[in-house]
Amino acid sequence: MEIHSSVVPAITNVKSLDEIRRSAKFHPTVWGDYFLAYNSDNTEITAAEHEEHAKQKEMVKKLLTLAPNDPTDKMQLIDAIQRLGLQYHFEKEIQEILQSIHANFKADKDLHTVALRFRLLRQHGYNVACDVFNNFLNKEGDFMESITNDFEGLLSLYEAAYLGTHGEEILDKAIEFCSFHLQSSLPQISNVSLSKRVEEALYIPTHKSLTRFGARKFIPIYEEDESHKKVLLNLAKLDFNIVQKIHQKELSDLTRWWTKLEVPKNMPYSRDRLVELFFWIVGVYFEPQFTTARRILVKAISMASLIDDTYEHATLDELKVLTDVIERWDTNAVIKDWPPYTQMCYKYLFDTYAEIEDEVEERESYRVQYAKKEMQKLVRAYFDEAKWLYKNYLPTWEEYMKVSTVTGAYMMLSTTSLVGMGDLVTKQDFDWVVREPLIVRASSVISRLMDDLVGDEDEQKPSGALCYMKQYGVSKEEACAEVRKHVKNAWKDMNQECLEPRPASMQVLTRVVNLGRVINLLYTGDDWYGNPLGSKEWVKMVFVEPLTI
């Protein structure tokens, strides 16, 4: 593509503009160059580790293929494999077992068995009916009090209910019923492993949790379970440590890339969050084969974060010119008399996307063009929000959602997440994702509104709740309840889109759903991205501390 050099007119009266310039005070990075210490020597996976890993995998594969005919035993084994973060090794075997269970469906009176089967089948795309839970209702249509003492069954029903779609009122009832009784029964649960599983589920249910982070928390809980399978536990620990070394090496390389940019020096108003962003993207795909995809997506989300902070810091005149430069993707633009940070902003962006182009094969270069267009769309939306702020304009709820679901960056990330996935995706997948299908819109709604719910009270930017309050004349509590309802409905949209017949492959859909899962963790109770102290322990668990074998 031919690029023409251009000169952009200078912005005048910079001193007076500085007086109205907005700025935010973000907590400095808590990691600095810590991960630079992880080099090829201390992240090397030894031959002994490879050999033991292969041996343990074969043993677990035999467990799956030679599992007894009892469907409940098979399902519990599959559930443990998934929660230990090992599913990616046994996808074929798991799919064959679930096909058989689905084809040979038998009614069951055991709540745990019914709920576990429902959850596993729905997780794998089977559109099984929720009326399997009717047997546990009384004549009034409420759940029977007799099941409240079945803690394992109650937990299984609670977990299964989060796979619900629109119109499945019995699952909405199940969440309310189970959460109340599990919470009130916690002191009575003597089984330590079960008690901890209940606590974790009440905080974030399995369906909404991250595979990698969830596995790190589940492994010690599984170890405390007297019925655990030793070979499965051993593989889970070894696999976790091996993948951790891969992530440490990637994070070391990315830290080196980030350090060379000198962001804190050149853009001191911005968030320095490379490590937290890597945690974010590992939530999208943690598996070893996605190293390139992770590197690309971390770089893209890092640029989005810098641009977001710049659009909240710069003046409207500066942003108008910056938006124009990015809209034209003018890599040779020369902007006279601009503050240095504005020029660094688009230089970082263009250089980073040039690096991304180098990451993919020539036959896949079209993918980067899709990614660029989504970034341009994101920048236009940032500019729309900036105009609202400078004009003191409070948008309607509809106007707000149209723009803010873009500035949440999940439309851009959904597209860019596919760029480095190799042969697992096609051009048709990119054509599909940029049309903003329902699952992408739903993930974007979750991203924006979860952020809004924990946003600072004194933020200058309008929030969904504020727009709803002013437009409909309701209280803050009522507006927040409406926002939560939209988040709940968005999860149901995503659940529906993952059932057969699917609009895209599960490899593609999983990236979009995982983005929703990341935001659910980061914005449950607080903004753990804006406040890195809160997520520091999570980072240590996943990237620093190996498991004891």
UniProtKB/Swiss-Prot annotation:
Transmembrane segments: none
One annotated GO biological process: diterpenoid biosynthetic process
Amino-acid positions noted as binding (2E,6E)-farnesyl diphosphate in the UniProt annotation, renumbered to this chain: 271, 308, 312, 448, 451
Annotated InterPro entries: Isoprenoid_synthase_dom_sf (IPR008949), Terpene_cyclase-like_1_C (IPR034741), Terpene_cyclase_plant_C1 (IPR044814), Terpene_synth_N (IPR001906), Terpene_synth_N_sf (IPR036965), Terpene_synthase-like (IPR050148), Terpene_synthase_metal-bd (IPR005630), Terpenoid_cyclase/PrenylTrfase (IPR008930)
Coiled coil: none
Cofactors (names): Mg(2+)
UniProt key word Membrane: no
Pathway terms, separated by semicolons: Secondary metabolite biosynthesis; terpenoid biosynthesis
Cofactor annotation comment: Binds 3 Mg(2+) ions per subunit.
Pfam families given in the database record: Terpene_synth (PF01397), Terpene_synth_C (PF03936)
Binding, Mg(2+) 3: 451, 459
List of residues binding Mg(2+) 1: 308, 312
Motif (DDXXD motif): 308-312
Keywords on record: Lyase, Magnesium, Metal-binding
Assigned protein family: Belongs to the terpene synthase family.
The protein's name: Germacrene D synthase
Lineage of origin: Eukaryota, Viridiplantae, Streptophyta, Embryophyta, Tracheophyta
